[in-house]
């Protein structure tokens, strides 16, 4: 039984061990399967990756840094635009450099005549001719002489004389001078000046174009004796004279300028070769015509002075090279060469003088009138004719002065010992007037000039008349300020002494000057004192010696210094009326019965300068004549109605910009004396002040109270300024 039990326990142990071994083996098998599956999956993945890459290891290996592609992209995006911009700028700079270089070469071009001239290009010249005088705009001289001989280039040109000198060439040799004036410039290797281009105009039917084109040529070929003295003929060399086409086209050369026409040549030949085989009648006619032309040439409006350079003292050779043939044009001044020139003259050269047509004469007169107004240099230059005219004028003035000295006008003698103060007018003392008889001569025999002179220098009332001093010592009547102070005597009754001269018992100066028989113009001045009594001082009681003695009016200060200034000044001086006014005048102003000078000018201002009106106490006005006296400053002021504007019209009220209402007529007169002394109007204004137009604007913001005289005082100290600013309408106004 024990053996059986042991056997059963052994079997159970064995079974237990076997179960544990089986579980362990299963776990190992399971773990092995997992490792095999993982290894197989890894190998399969590796195999799949290795299957995708078909290159070398370096090719299949991915780069560790991926910024390579980014840098390439950024570099291309930046470098390409920058390179394109640099290339474009280089092209532009190259073009600008070439253009500037070309302009610099054109600026240094000797053919350049100026910015105001248009230089057209003409046809090409002959290849063998070298133009040596392109800088003087004369490079086409040989072309005109050799290729295109001018048959009649100056037809209708404005010459100084009445006649025109022309050269007639046979049709076989010369051809017509015809060029289209509206010809467009053509492309060429060389360019001519505007003067040469404008000279080539059509002969007929151009009108103003012809006048404008040939004005310069006409001025250079004017028939003036001075021009002929500065001209010398040209003798060509033997080879130059052999050609038949060159015989009749020699032209003169000025001292410093080549002539472009044959008109001057014809004139020179007329003066240089008087011994030609011509009829006596034709010679005499030509001489008469030339004399007339010389006389008329002195008044030439188109005459220009030809500059005489230093080349006048030596000979100048002009050479035009063409291969081996050198044509020489020598400026020779010996008489023997002039004889050779006259002997070599061709029979085909027939020079004559012809009259101008009426149209040409009319054009000449028109151009002369325009030239004399705008371009005449004679007005700014001294000439012998002007000296002669001045001498004649001086002689006439001397004769006139002699006549005046024989009959001297009354002059003014001023006492230099007068005590003149800067601000005060000295009181007049008892001045003794001496009645000096004037020369009782008949002024009519010296004509109206003497009478006019006597009118311009009348006798002064309060000044001593002297018949020994010269007339120019008088003061001109148009002067506002007189040289001497007219003495006045201020008394309680405003007594004024006025001396009116009596001339032979009647008045000699009735307003406009002399009247009646001129035989009565001789007179003897006698001064009689006529004291007049006034209730109101006359305006002439304010006399000043000189403008400097008046009040100094300062310039308007800048706004920055306006606060520190004592008062606000302007260039216009406003002065309040004097407080010492008569009660009657104040009453008349308050009642509105004072006369307005604008409404009644005849009561205050006389139609002439020799009378004025003075107000009286009874309201009447009396006229007092100052016969023959120089107008006083107050009379000159009255002649232009220099009246204080505040005395003529009522002062307007202050109306700021942007007002919401229209000020009534009563409020527009709030600063006048009538409004200030009228209780009814003041009550109306007070009602308007208290009433509100709207909730935005107050009446006191629009209308200035009557008690406020002005915005700022025009004179006074800083205290006055503060007082004025403190009494504004924004505060309580009494």
UniProtKB/Swiss-Prot annotation:
Residue(s) carrying Phosphothreonine: 169, 221
Compositionally biased spans, kind Low complexity: 37-51, 280-299
Compartments, as annotated in UniProt: Membrane
Regions of compositional bias (Polar residues) in chain numbering: 53-68, 253-273, 661-671, 725-734
GO annotation terms (biological process): negative regulation of mitotic cytokinesis
Record's signal peptide: none
Residue ranges crossing the lipid bilayer per the database entry: 72-96
Region listing for Disordered, in residue ranges: 30-68, 239-327, 647-671, 707-734
UniProt record similarity statement: Belongs to the SKG6/TOS2 family.
Protein known as: Protein SKG6
């Amino acid at each position: 039984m024990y053996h059986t039990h042991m056997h059963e326990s052994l079997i159970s142990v064995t079974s237990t061990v076997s179960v544990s071994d089986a579980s362990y083996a299963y776990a190992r098998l399971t773990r092995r399967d997992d490792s095999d599956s993982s290894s197989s999956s890894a190998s399969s993945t590796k195999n799949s990756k290795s299957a995708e890459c078909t290159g070398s290891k370096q090719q299949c290996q991915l780069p560790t840094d991926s910024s390579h592609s980014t840098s390439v992209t950024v570099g291309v995006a930046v470098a390409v635009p920058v390179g394109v911009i640099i290339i474009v700028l280089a092209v532009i700079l190259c073009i600008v450099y070439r253009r500037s270089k070309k302009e610099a070469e054109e600026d240094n071009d000797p053919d350049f005549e100026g910015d105001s001239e248009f230089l057209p290009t003409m046809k090409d010249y002959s290849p063998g001719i070298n133009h040596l005088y392109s800088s003087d705009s004369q490079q086409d001289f040989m072309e005109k002489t050799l290729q295109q001989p001018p048959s009649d280039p100056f037809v209708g040109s404005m010459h100084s004389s009445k006649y025109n000198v022309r050269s007639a060439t046979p049709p076989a040799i010369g051809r017509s001078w015809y060029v289209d004036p509206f010809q467009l410039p053509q492309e060429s290797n060389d360019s001519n000046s505007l003067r040469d281009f404008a000279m080539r105009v059509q002969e007929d039917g151009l009108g103003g174009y012809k006048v404008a084109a040939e004005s310069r040529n006409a001025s250079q070929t004017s028939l003036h004796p001075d021009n002929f003295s500065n001209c010398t003929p040209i003798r060509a060399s033997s080879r130059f004279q052999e050609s038949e086409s060159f015989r009749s086209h020699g032209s003169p050369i000025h001292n410093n300028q080549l002539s472009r026409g044959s008109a001057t040549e014809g004139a020179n030949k007329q003066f240089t070769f008087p011994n030609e085989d011509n009829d006596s009648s034709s010679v005499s006619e030509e001489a008469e015509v030339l004399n007339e032309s010389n006389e008329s040439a002195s008044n030439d409006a188109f005459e220009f002075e030809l500059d005489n350079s230093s080349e006048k003292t030596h000979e100048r050779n002009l050479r035009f090279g063409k291969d081996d043939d050198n044509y020489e044009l020598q400026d020779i001044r010996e008489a023997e060469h002039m004889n050779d020139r006259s002997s070599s003259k061709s029979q085909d050269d027939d020079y004559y003088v012809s009259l101008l047509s009426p149209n040409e004469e009319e054009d000449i007169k028109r151009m002369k009138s325009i030239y004399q107004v705008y371009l005449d240099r004679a007005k700014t230059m001294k000439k012998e004719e002007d000296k002669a005219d001045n001498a004649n004028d001086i002689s006439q003035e001397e004769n006139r002065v002699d006549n005046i000295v024989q009959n001297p006008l009354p002059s003014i003698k001023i006492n230099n010992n007068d005590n003149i103060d800067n601000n005060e007018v000295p009181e007049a003392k008892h001045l003794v007037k001496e009645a000096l008889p004037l020369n009782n001569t008949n002024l009519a025999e010296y004509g109206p000039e003497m009478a006019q002179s006597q009118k311009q220098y009348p006798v002064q009332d309060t000044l001593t008349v002297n018949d020994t001093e010269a007339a120019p010592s008088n003061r001109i009547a148009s002067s506002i300020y007189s040289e001497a102070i007219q003495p006045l005597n201020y008394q309680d009754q405003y007594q004024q002494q006025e001396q009116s001269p009596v001339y032979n018992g009647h008045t000699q100066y009735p307003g406009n000057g002399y009247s009646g028989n001129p035989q009565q113009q001789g007179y003897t001045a006698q001064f009689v004192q006529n004291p007049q009594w006034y209730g109101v001082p006359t305006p002439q009681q304010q006399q000043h010696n000189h403008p400097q003695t008046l009040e100094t009016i300062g310039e308007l200060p800048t706004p920055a210094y306006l606060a520190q200034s004592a008062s606000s000044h302007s260039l216009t001086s406003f002065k309040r009326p004097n407080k010492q006014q008569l009660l009657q005048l104040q009453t008349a102003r308050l009642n509105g019965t004072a006369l307005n000078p604008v409404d009644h000018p005849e009561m205050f201002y006389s139609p002439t300068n020799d009378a004025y009106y003075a107000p009286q106490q009874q309201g009447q006005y009396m006229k007092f004549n100052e016969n023959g006296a120089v107008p006083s400053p107050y009379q000159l002021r009255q002649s232009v109605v220099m009246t204080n504007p505040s005395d003529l019209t009522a002062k307007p009220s202050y109306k700021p910009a942007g007002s919401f209402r229209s000020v009534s007529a009563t409020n527009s007169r709030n600063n006048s004396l009538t409004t200030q002394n009228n209780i009814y109007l003041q009550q109306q204004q007070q009602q308007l002040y208290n009433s509100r137009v709207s909730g935005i604007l107050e009446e006191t913001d629009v209308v200035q109270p009557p008690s406020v005289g002005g915005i700022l005082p025009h004179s006074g100290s800083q205290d006055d300024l503060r007082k004025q600013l403190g009494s504004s309408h924004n505060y309580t106004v009494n």
